[in-house]
Design a protein with these regions (language model features):
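N-terminal helix-turn-helix/winged-helix DNA-binding helices
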Residues: 1, 40-74, 83, 93-94, ...
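Flexible loop/turn connectors
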Residues: 4, 228, 232-340
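Hinge/beta->alpha junction and helix N-cap segments in small-molecule ligand-binding domains
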Residues: 31, 61-71, 89-98, 120-124, ...
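Short, well-structured alpha-helical segments in soluble
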Residues: 98-111, 223-235
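Short beta-strand-centered segments that line the small-molecule binding cleft or hinge
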Residues: 100-111, 115-162
Length: 340
């Protein structure tokens, strides 16, 4: 673990000054205190005091507005409680500095491990240094839907590549040949994996990549903006796959605003399987994450890490499920040909 001497060196102060800050001594100038506290956060410094097993784990989510994240957090909490583990939920609002602050707070509380859901690790342009320090310090952490090959951290989640492939295969089976992708930000790993799955399915069907992809922020407005962009293309799509159900609901809204009928004019497929998809108009076809399986395996993996940190803890990826509802149909040209 980082020592007080490391903190002092980072902050450019004496060990005695760093010690006074760590012990809450008020006899330190405010600007000096701020430098030392910043160094503590950056180094994930925790005072070297003996702790008993706390039974606490941290669960960090990027936001609460998208229902899939509270659903995953709740499923984790439900499975952790019978094992004697109490969850502390932290909403990072997709901000690296906030995630780092929460990590420091959780370590200070003596958590036995942490589960990061769709964390900053999925942002390929993001700040990853705190994960590297956590691994170096032997912290017990598990990524959920945050796959990485760069750190020795077990990852549990849905197979994002399979999700993109499954959605594309289904739309091809309906007769669609112009299949757009309403994507999240390009520099996020889940976006790239879904895009790769889509490309694989197109190639397997003998269809060339048509680059009908529009990148936008995750969320309702992002989905609407991405669809608007795709519809302005010279040869717009007859179907779209969305990075999330929330983006897909934004697509439904934008389609209705433009007077398009879903699915007669445009088929829409979401991703996640949130409860709201059963109540959208029309009901949304979606690629569903196995949330309960993911939560069970994440808690099990973390508990094994806590008990046996030196053992091998492999990654676990689950194949998603296609839920066909009312937002998808054959394209108009196929329907006309079939009725002729």
């Amino acid at each position: 673990m980082a020592s007080l001497r490391d903190v002092a060196r980072r902050a450019g102060v004496s060990v005695a000054t760093a010690s006074r800050v760590a012990n809450g001594n008020p006899a330190v100038r405010p600007d000096t205190r701020e430098r030392v506290e910043r160094a503590m956060r950056e180094l994930l410094y925790v005072p070297d005091t003996p702790r008993a097993d706390t039974g606490l784990i941290g669960v960090l989510v990027p936001e609460l507005a998208n229902p899939v994240f509270p659903a995953l957090a709740e499923a984790i909490e439900t499975r952790a409680a019978p094992r004697g583990l109490a969850s502390i939920l932290c909403n990072t609002t997709s901000a690296a500095f906030r995630e780092i602050d929460y990590v420091h707070m959780l370590l200070d509380r003596g958590v036995e491990g942490m589960i990061f859901i769709s964390c900053e690790m999925t942002n390929l342009r993001g700040e990853h240094g705190h994960y590297e320090r956590l691994v170096e310090e032997g912290a017990r952490i598990v990524f959920v839907n945050g796959a990485t090959n760069t750190l020795d951290v077990p990852s549990v989640g849905v197979d994002e590549r399979a999700a993109g492939e499954l959605a594309t295969q289904y739309l091809i089976s309906l007769g669609h040949t112009r299949i757009g992708f309403v994507a999240g930000p390009e520099h996020y790993l889940p976006t790239q994996l879904k895009a790769a799955g889509r490309a694989t399915a197109l190639a397997a069907a003998g269809m060339r990549e048509d680059f009908l992809v529009a990148y936008a922020d995750f969320g309702l407005e992002g989905g609407g903006r991405a669809l608007a962009e795709l519809l302005e293309r010279p040869d717009p799509p007859t179907a779209v796959i969305c990075s999330s159900d929330v983006m897909a609901i934004g697509v439904l809204h934008e389609a209705a605003r433009r007077g398009l009928n879903v699915p007669a004019d445009l088929s829409v497929v979401g991703f996640d399987g949130i409860e709201a998809t059963k109540w959208s108009v029309p009901e949304l076809t979606t690629i569903e994450q196995p949330i309960d399986l993911i939560a069970e395996r994440a808690v099990d993996t973390l508990q094994r890490l806590i008990a046996s940190p030196g053992d091998d803890h492999p990654n676990s990826y689950y194949r998603p499920t296609l839920r066909v509802r009312a937002s998808t149909a054959a394209p108009a040209a196929v329907r006309v040909a079939a009725s002729a």
